[in-house]
């Protein structure tokens, strides 16, 4: 009624009380309404400005998904979506060490819950004021990452049971030449040859093997084109297989994907009609030349059917990883008889052309994405026969810096790919979301220790803010390296009269800091070099050669000991140091490194895992040292150290 009587009257007129006044009083409405409207517009603009600022602040505070570890790496695939989810049941030891009754909080009275909360808070205060996070766990300072979901008891038991069923490479359904290559070349010199945990899980899965209750590994039915002569040529190709290998650093992922790839390569080669016909023609030519040894007729060799068309392509982010993976593949190729080629920025254009387009053919190609993408632009057929594509260090190659180059390569090769394998030691949320949307049927093979630094790596913390360093990290770093060198100099090596050389890696956050720290260490008598993005590829490979070698380095024991020379000319001859950024923290198999110094505290726990993962590889012991200053988060370092001691995954 009131609204109908007033008619269409603005809010300013209603507030002024002149809505029902005489017509003569309407002259005052425009001025009053204009003033109120102006203030209303200012209020709305200020509210919208503050709201936009709040949104921008929230957007700034949100951690990028590429810097956050995923908590659902081992989730089931979309193929299991039609199954009814199983009820998660606690294991038989779930009730041990409980301090609070396992009641449903909703059924308890409010008073009892308040009393229990008060008791817990007072207990935490008596224990030194330890604060808990939102989820009740002790990792509160690591709020830049979200907590990883704990592996269920049933899943952990199942994975460990699978791992215990395999204790030898003889249990894998490998071709004789591939098995011989693994035992006599790739693992030559090892006394106790056993598969690592990721190899026990990944190799059978990539080979298509299943396990019985009390039997050894059995093979599935082979595809129609894997060797059966009765297979119809018009039969549809088998479906593409997609795998994610997620395991801790230094666990042997390279051999885990190389061995099945070699096995599939040799099986396909034995049934390829083009290769069979080519081998027959070559045999006839050799027989003809043997009958006429004096013949001077020289025929041009026929190009191999695999010329410039490899079957296996392996992508890695750096030239160092090209050399590292290439060495393992070459060792297998010597016995398995495969043509492996490596291309990187260290090679000239002529060498790359001779290797890729050689008439002898190519079976396995190991390259960086940028180099392979440039070749594929001018020669698209190079990816036309790829049956196995491996993306190593997938968290880097599918990140923002590489994804624009890596994704087109995957798209070009997808029509012919039989098996797609992605490997990484850390799975950020961005990569997890990408795989869930792009490859929803991908099978995820994860080890129980994913996102955890091995317990065999000890972590020490040096508070640089205290005496005698007084905030000088350069002095603290040099002192730590001198302590390591002098300790090693007190013990003789395997040869009498010689001491072992300690190879140490120092990690910094900024590229400019590498040269500064390296120069300071040189001034203190330490053999140190800087490794960063501006260092040439050849120089990088040269510096990392001694750090990736498994051979022991030793020098004659100096007179008077390692540090027995006069102070004016003190040197530390039994140490070699590389000062590097995260360029050297991804994938490089630094078997000789036992000590890692973190000059700067890493920005994320992902960098913690990769940097400390340079030590203690392949079951060896290692030690990490973190230099903590006043500007660093000491609580984060303390929680990382505690999680390493407990063998827990980082958050």
From Swiss-Prot:
Location of the motif DEAD box: 392-395
Main location: mitochondrion
Keywords recorded for this protein, A-Z: ATP-binding, Helicase, Hydrolase, Mitochondrion, Nucleotide-binding, RNA-binding, Transit peptide
Domain Helicase C-terminal: 494-651
Subcellular localization: Mitochondrion
Compositionally biased region (Basic and acidic residues): 72-83, 124-137
GO molecular function, a single term: ATP hydrolysis activity
Keyword Transit peptide carried by entry: yes
Biased composition (Low complexity): 224-233
InterPro entries: DEAD/DEAH_box_helicase_dom, Helicase_ATP-bd, Helicase_C-like, P-loop_NTPase
Record: transit peptide: 1-61
Origin superkingdom: Eukaryota
Region forming the signal peptide: none
List of residues binding ATP: 247-254
GO CC terms in record: mitochondrion
EC number per UniProt: 3.6.4.13
PROSITE patterns the record matches: HELICASE_ATP_BIND_1 (PS51192), HELICASE_CTER (PS51194), Q_MOTIF (PS51195)
Catalytic function, reaction form: ATP + H2O = ADP + phosphate + H(+)
Annotated motif Q motif, positions: 167-200
Domain Helicase ATP-binding: 234-445
Polar residues: compositionally biased ranges: 45-56
Protein function: ATP-binding RNA helicase involved in mitochondrial RNA metabolism. Required for maintenance of mitochondrial DNA.
Family stated for the protein in its record: Belongs to the DEAD box helicase family. MRH4 subfamily.
Free-text note regarding domains: The Q motif is unique to and characteristic of the DEAD box family of RNA helicases and controls ATP binding and hydrolysis.
Family matches, as PANTHER family: DEAD-BOX ATP-DEPENDENT RNA HELICASE 50
Protein known as: ATP-dependent RNA helicase MRH4, mitochondrial
Annotated organism of origin: Pyricularia oryzae (strain 70-15 / ATCC MYA-4617 / FGSC 8958)
